[in-house]
Every structure is written in C-alpha cells, then in structure tokens.
Amino acid sequence: MPNRQAASAPVLARGQGVVYRELPCRSLLNRSTSRRMPFTWTINPYRGCEFGCRYCYARYTHEFMGLEDPHLFETEIFAKTNASDALARDLARLKDPGSGIAMGTATDPYQPAERKALVTRGILELLARSEDARGIRFSITTKSDLVTRDLDVLREIGHRMRLSVNITITTLNRRLSRILEPRAPRPGRRLLAVKALAEAGIRTGVFIMPVLPGITDRPASLEAIASAASRAGASTIAHQVLFLMSSAKRSFYPFLSERFPRLLAGYRRTYALSAYNTAAYRKRIDLLMESLRKRYDLDGRSDPDRAPGRRPDLQMSLAFRE
C-alpha cells in the first residue's frame, strides 16, 4: 500500500495521538523467510503497534506502505478487519502447515486497538472451529494481559491445535519498563497473565526478548524474571540478545542518546558492521540463561511441543507484504 493509499485508508477510530485505520487483506498467512525459525507461517492481525517499544525491530514494515517515519509505526495503526475470512481461505488451500503458525511476530496482537477492533479474537474464533486448522502447531506472542480475555476460545483451540502462548517480559523494573515499553502493560500484569494462562491448562512461556546490553542484562535481573516466571507457572523461558538492524537504529540510537547516553558509543561500535552482538557476548548470555532454565525447571522437558532456549534470528522472519 503506497503512502497515498495508506493516508486514505478508512479511519476506524482516533485516540490520543493515534489513528486507527482499516486495512483489508487478501491473505493473512505469511511464510517465514528463515528456515531456522520454529514456525513456517506468521499471522499479524495489525500493521503497526501502539506499545511503542523503543527497541522494536518491526518499524520498517510501515515502509512497505510508504510510511518512512519510524514514529508512524506506533501512531498509524492498521487493523486487518477481514482477517478471519482471509485466514479461512488460506487454511482451506494450505497443503503443508510445516512447523506451524506464529501470531504476533511483527505487531502485538493484543495492543490497545484489539479491545474494540476484535481482529485477534475473530482469528481465534475461526481457528477454534476450523477443521483445516486441526492438529497444527499455533503460538501467540504478546506483552499484554488482554490475552486473558480470550481464555474461553484459547481453551477450545488447545483441544484442536498444539497451542502455546508466550508472554514477553524484558524487565521486572516498573520504571525501566515504562522507559523501554512506554505503552505496554506493566510487568506485574504480564506475570498475572502467565499465571491465568497456566492455570487454564494452556502451555505458557516467557520470552526475554530482547536482552539489552548494559540495560537489562544483569544476571540478577535475568534471574528475577526466571524466578517470577517459574512461580507464575510458565513451562519455559526463551531469550534473544538485541538484534539491531539499520532500520531500527534510526529510532533506537536517538533514544539511547537521550536516556542512556553513556551506552551509545558502545552500541555504535558493537553494531557497526553487523546486526548481531559479538559471539562472545551472546555465548555468555546463552550460558547464563541455560543455567537459569535448569535452576527453575523452565526447560520444557515435559512439553514436547516447546523449543526452549535461544530463539535464533527471530526478527529475520518478519519480512512480509500482505
């Protein structure tokens, strides 16, 4: 959708500095571009995300619509209002589900728009009744406790599909969370969502993604998340060190300059030639997280459908143009 069409898309509602628009889609399933991913297909009910996470890697997806300013990713939200119909068509002709479907890879399916738009709810209701979806692995990733609104339909899906729900928690520090993820629910509310999902019998994991060097990577901080996740009933934790593409630097570096100026030079050096942190740093975090998984029984050994640990190149699966 070029810029002119994006600007003329029907307005569904307006919020404080946010415009919600309608975006019909011909297809909802998008094939992952990376063979290393633990899923083959992705679903993103929205384009853009109001949570405004400072490290967000998906801002570049608005560029496909001619919206070049990274800030527009959190202020121009497009709802795929015919998503369930599009998904029904996709599933009917899906010959190979591969390693399954992941929802929420380039937007949060439970961002504020979902309270009224109900796009995610419609998708879940379709999956709960679709014979074409039976037996497929399906995962949801979110930072929002709004997911508990849909416990009824998630239970139904759990009887038909291999369902897991992952709650992303990057820090338990409320103040730091407000700085990094200004409009996302606080960490305590996310932990309550983990507890509610687990008590409902839904396989539930916690994603520590991304681990931010010098900001959220203290061993005590990571252990606090692991301990809290275990107490809440999570079966796994997974992590990923910040993967910083050039497009994300446009908004992330100014943020660092304002809030963490002493770290900016180090980030520039580390990510100058690659979107990855150094192998030595990633190995150190991997070893720490592996020890925490064992210590808090979060390795998913009793759950064959889960793949705990480091999630390789998650951001690389996000190229989509539907």
Report residues per predicted region:
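Conserved Radical SAM active-site core
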Residues: 3, 7, 11-46, 51-166, ...
